Amino acid sequence: MKISRICLGAMQFGNTAPWMVELEDARKIWKKAWDLGINCIDTANVYSRGRSEEIVGELVKGMREDVVIATKVFGQMGNGPNDRGLSRKHVMRQI
């Protein structure tokens, strides 16, 4: 599979800030990106406390073989010692 030169950033997908968009608007953004040849989405566990990743999952349903998802798992998701970083426990919890 070839990855598009441009990747769609999904930090704006979610609901924790006034500038973010939920699923309906995210679908419009993704459709436009897809129509322009973009097949890569970048997200992270800390984007809207995981909501961005949930939205991305909804967006790529049925087309998973054609899309590249880049995500990050380092971010702090809680107050415990294993709620951030790259420990095996944290990484496995995030995926």
Which residues make up each language-model segment?
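Active-site mouth loops of central-metabolism enzymes
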Residues: 12-24, 77-92
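Short, well-ordered amphipathic alpha-helical segments that serve as non-catalytic structural scaffolds
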Residues: 29, 90-95
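A short, structured active-site edge motif that brings together acidic residues
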Residues: 66-78
